[in-house]
């Protein structure tokens, strides 16, 4: 089983852009050296707790600092980009990384980002994402066209476009060709329509964990959509995000986790988000408890939401998740702000990739 890293980035709002840039590059190096397979970076323009508006800048800067790890924007919010420009950017960046790149796409789920880009809400964004991606695919195909859609326009020059000039067109298509470019989509709610859309197009699924039943529904929704279009689903392509903290003992891991940036993020930021998207009921059901989401505290999180403990304990928790939810190919660690005390966090990441996941029984 692979290890992945999701650099959302869940940073303290007081951090400067330079602090986040330097922290991001350090995390990429730590994950690469530890043996992580993938490093994914969020894209948000207005969220003080998730403040990386340009993931491609982090990816480009991290390219020469790392050797094996793959990078992805997770995700480029397509309605907010010019499709032709983004298609060229994605292709060129994948060439810089010589294949250590894949692409996450999304419509955008935060109203403040939508307002910044001139939308009153997020309602129309999904349709715009579909159109944007269709135009990006045409640009990558490198065949002459000119198209004005409902929301965007794009084209690709050919020999008849400017016959009076002999122009050699740059090849900024994805490294290895379009078929070599993996596209991934995240799912949040049960029976996610986003993952259905992904399955119909042979894109890879990423499940934001909201309990075992939700996780299983994410895979089943994606797999059924894959099969409906003649594709073959495989659990090795299924990724799931989790909160993880590992130390020598369960007690030490719990102590470190509750003193970490992960605890601060949950206390001040993630509690409202999980309540907004109704993610707690599935987690409460998994715990076998009859409580209201308002009763959830840090101890509940450490026991039932975070994968927190010794390497052996975390291994057991992952195996229990696999048994109850059907399996996955990659566990993705959610990123948290541990700039002020990074070493326990780095140790946890290293132990996950080197001591825990290689020993997880996947069947």
From Swiss-Prot:
GO BP annotations of the record are: (+)-camphor catabolic process
Q: What is its EC number?
A: 1.14.14.108
Name the job this protein performs.
Involved in the degradation and assimilation of (+)-camphor, which allows P.putida strain NCIMB 10007 to grow on this enantiomer of camphor as the sole carbon source. Catalyzes the FMNH(2)-dependent lactonization of 2,5-diketocamphane via a Baeyer-Villiger oxidation to produce the unstable lactone 5-oxo-1,2-campholide with (R,R) configuration, that presumably undergoes spontaneous hydrolysis to form 2-oxo-Delta(3)-4,5,5-trimethylcyclopentenylacetate. Is also able to convert (+)-camphor and norcamphor to the corresponding lactone in vitro.
- GO molecular function terms listed in the Swiss-Prot or TrEMBL record: 2,5-diketocamphane 1,2-monooxygenase
The pathway to which it is assigned is: Terpene metabolism; (R)-camphor degradation
Q: Which UniProt keywords apply?
A: Flavoprotein, FMN, Monooxygenase, Oxidoreductase, Plasmid
Q: Which amino acid positions bind FMN, per UniProt? A: 74, 186-194
Highest taxon of the source? Answer: Bacteria
* GO cellular component labels: cytosol
According to UniProt, the name of this protein is 2,5-diketocamphane 1,2-monooxygenase 2
Q: Which organism is it from?
A: Pseudomonas putida (Arthrobacter siderocapsulatus)
Q: What is the lineage of its organism?
A: Bacteria, Pseudomonadati, Pseudomonadota, Gammaproteobacteria, Pseudomonadales
Q: Which family does it belong to?
A: Belongs to the bacterial luciferase oxidoreductase family.
Q: In what way does activity depend on pH?
A: Optimum pH is 8.0.
Q: What does it catalyze?
A: (1R,4R)-bornane-2,5-dione + FMNH2 + O2 = (1R,4R)-5-oxo-1,2-campholide + FMN + H2O + H(+)
Which proteins does it associate with, and in what oligomeric form?
Answer: Homodimer. Likely forms a loose transient complex with a P.putida flavin reductase that provides the required FMNH(2) to the enzyme.
* Top-rank EC class of the record's enzyme: oxidoreductase
């Amino acid at each position: 089983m692979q290890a992945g890293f999701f650099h959302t980035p869940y940073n303290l709002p007081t951090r400067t852009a330079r602090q986040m840039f330097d922290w991001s590059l350090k995390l990429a190096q730590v994950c690469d050296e530890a043996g992580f397979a993938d490093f994914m970076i969020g894209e948000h323009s207005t969220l003080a707790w998730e403040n990386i508006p340009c993931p491609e800048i982090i990816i480009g800067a991290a390219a020469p600092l790392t050797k094996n790890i793959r990078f992805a924007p997770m995700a480029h919010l397509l309605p907010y980009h010019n499709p032709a420009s983004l298609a060229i950017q994605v292709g060129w960046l994948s060439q810089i990384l010589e294949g250590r790149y894949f692409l996450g796409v999304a419509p955008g789920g935060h109203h403040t980002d939508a307002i910044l880009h001139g939308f009153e809400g997020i309602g129309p964004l999904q349709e715009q994402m579909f159109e944007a991606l269709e135009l990006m695919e045409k640009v990558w195909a490198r065949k002459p066209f000119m198209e004005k859609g409902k929301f965007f326009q794009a084209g690709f020059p050919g020999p008849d476009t400017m016959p009076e000039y002999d122009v050699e067109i740059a090849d900024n298509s994805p490294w290895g060709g379009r078929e070599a470019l993996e596209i991934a989509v995240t799912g949040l709610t049960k029976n996610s329509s986003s993952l259905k859309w992904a399955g119909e197009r042979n894109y890879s699924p990423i499940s934001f964990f909201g309990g075992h039943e939700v996780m299983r529904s994410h895979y089943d929704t994606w797999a059924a959509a894959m099969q409906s279009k003649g594709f073959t689903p495989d659990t090795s392509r299924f990724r799931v995000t989790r909160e993880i903290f590992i130390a020598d003992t369960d007690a030490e891991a719990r102590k470190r986790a509750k003193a970490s940036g992960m605890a601060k993020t949950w206390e001040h930021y993630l509690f409202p988000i999980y309540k907004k998207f109704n993610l707690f009921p599935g987690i409460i059901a998994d715990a076998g408890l009859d409580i209201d989401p308002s009763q959830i505290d840090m101890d509940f999180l450490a026991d039932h939401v975070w994968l927190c403990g010794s390497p052996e304990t975390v291994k057991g928790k992952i195996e229990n998740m696999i048994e109850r939810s059907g399996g996955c190919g990659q566990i993705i660690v959610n990123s948290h702000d541990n700039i002020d005390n990074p070493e326990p966090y780095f140790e946890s990441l290293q132990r996950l990739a080197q001591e825990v996941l290689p020993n997880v029984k996947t069947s």
